[in-house]
A protein has these predicted regions:
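Walker B catalytic motif
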Residues: 168-172, 179
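Conserved structural motif at the start of ABC-family nucleotide-binding domains
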Residues: 2-4, 17-19
């Protein structure tokens, strides 16, 4: 599904990613961990298509297409979803209007018929019930006045509605209490299937106790220096990153 080969990325002429390679197949859940400044958020921003991140080498393919040649909007149309650490607030725009606009943009990109207000309302009722979310979430302005947990619920709702093939969560657990963490984990777990993949970018292991990724990678100085299964998470919890960084 996603194939990253020898990726090099710079920000303001400073090299951040220095030869990162990663393959993600359908249905897999990968965790990207690492100390501060290792390049985790740079990887997320590059996959999302942020213009201020300059790719200086390597390739990124998504479902066989050159991802780096696609605009952020087209990447969303192809099936990539990004949940940011700090979701944007949009005053005056209701969640329902925002989600219908986003979904119909994706459907138009794929050559599918757009949904009218009534069909979309039926879809929303289905998703709200599935995720056990309060209905008033739909009438509120996007993320305005939301608690940390509510913002994460909104991310999960967006994923459920848009049904992306690859979901990237960029430090979505940052600053969250245990209840909000469970909101994120429960949402991710409810959307896991044999086709949808996840990349969980995090500095801490606590959210991974609930999501339990199949693959865990440690990023350091712009490269993946260690990969393993969930036992690597426990090892990092006990020993930190020092034993890995000292080997580099």
């Amino acid at each position: 599904m996603l194939s990253i080969k020898d990726l090099h990325v710079s920000v303001e002429d400073k090299a951040i990613l220095r030869g990162l390679s990663l393959d993600v197949r359908p249905g897999e859940v990968h965790a990207i961990m690492g100390p501060n400044g290792s390049g985790k958020s740079t990887l997320s921003a590059t996959l999302a298509g942020r213009e201020d991140y300059e790719v200086t080498g390597g390739t990124v393919e998504f479902k066989g297409k050159d991802l780096l040649a696609l605009s952020p909007e087209d990447r969303a149309g192809e099936g990539i979803f990004m949940a940011f650490q700090y979701p944007v607030e949009i005053p005056g725009v209701s969640n329902q209007f925002f989600l219908q606009t986003a979904l119909n943009a994706v459907r138009s990109y794929r050559g599918q018929e757009t949904l009218d207000r009534f069909d979309f309302q039926d879809l929303m009722e289905e998703k709200i019930a599935l995720l056990k979310m309060p209905e008033d979430l739909l009438t509120r302005s996007v993320n305005v006045g939301f608690s940390g947990g509510e913002k994460k619920r909104n991310d999960i709702l967006q994923m459920a509605v848009l049904e992306p093939e690859l979901c990237i969560l960029d430090e979505s657990d940052s600053g969250l209490d245990i209840d909000a963490l469970k909101v994120v984990a429960d949402g991710v777990n409810s959307l896991r299937d044999g086709k949808r993949s996840f990349i969980i970018v995090t500095h801490y292991q606590r959210i991974l106790d609930y999501i339990k990724p199949v693959y865990v990678h440690v990023l350091y100085q712009g490269r993946i220096v260690k990969s393993g299964d969930f036992t690597l998470v426990k090892q990092l919890e006990e020993q930190g990153y020092g034993w890995l960084t000292e080997q580099q």
